[in-house]
Every structure is written in structure tokens, then in C-alpha cells.
From Swiss-Prot:
Top-level lineage group: Bacteria
Annotated source species: Pectobacterium carotovorum subsp. carotovorum (strain PC1)
Cross-referenced Pfam families: DUF440
Coiled coil: none
Disulfide partners: none
Family listed: Belongs to the putative dsDNA mimic protein family.
Name the record gives this protein: Putative double-stranded DNA mimic protein PC1_1990
HAMAP family: Put_dsDNA_mimic
Role summary: May act as a double-stranded DNA (dsDNA) mimic. Probably regulates the activity of a dsDNA-binding protein.
Gene3D superfamilies cross-referenced by the UniProt entry: dsDNA mimic, putative (3.10.450.140)
Length: 107
């Protein structure tokens, strides 16, 4: 993989959020979608992290944080707080030539 051909943090966040919006209706409960849409302006967010260790239970490849990122999308208690009501965790490949993502949805 090429370190010089990676998505920036902002590009990774934007791409993960776009994928979330495209697939949310098929994967979230309608009540959760309504709550997210009503509250996102005030309490919503997307945060970028290195991939959590539990992704190893869901994927069968090395999760090098140079090339993979986890984006947590959801709602916080208050604006600026950490996201506590998680609607999706998106694992995304940051290399521009490898379009790969996995999503763990709120159950």
C-alpha cells in the first residue's frame, strides 16, 4: 500500500458518512433513523479512530492504522461530547485505490 496515496482524515470521515447515509435506511430501525435525523444537527457527529481490536472478529486481514480507519457515527449527550449513542461503526480503507469498507450497525 502507498502512504502517499491515502485519504486525508477529513476525506475518510466524509466518505464513511456518505456511505452511512446511503445504507442507513436498509440497516437501521426506522425509529433510530428518525431520532438520528432529528438530533444530528445538535448532538450528532462522526469521529475518526484507529481501528478497534474487535474488528479482528469481523474481518480477515491486517488492520494497519496507516491504511485503515474506524469512523464512529452517532449522537452525543451534548454538543462537543464523546459519541455515546452509536448508530454505525465504519471500517474504511484509507488508500484511494482500494475502495473497501465494513459497517457494524446499531442493533
Amino acid at each position: 500500500m502507498d502512504l502517499n496515496n491515502r485519504l486525508t482524515e477529513d476525506e475518510a470521515l466524509e466518505q464513511a458518512y456518505d456511505i452511512f447515509l446511503e445504507l442507513a435506511a436498509d440497516n437501521l430501525d426506522p425509529a433510530d433513523i428518525l431520532l438520528f435525523n432529528l438530533q444530528f444537527e445538535e448532538r450528532g457527529g462522526a469521529e475518526l479512530f484507529d481501528p478497534a481490536e474487535d474488528w479482528a472478529e469481523h474481518v480477515d486481514f491486517d488492520l494497519n492504522p496507516d491504511f485503515f480507519a474506524e469512523v464512529v457515527i452517532g449522537l452525543a449527550e451534548n454538543e462537543g461530547d464523546e459519541i455515546t449513542d452509536i448508530f454505525a461503526r465504519v471500517l474504511i480503507c484509507r488508500e484511494k485505490d482500494h475502495k473497501l469498507c465494513h459497517i457494524l450497525w446499531k442493533e
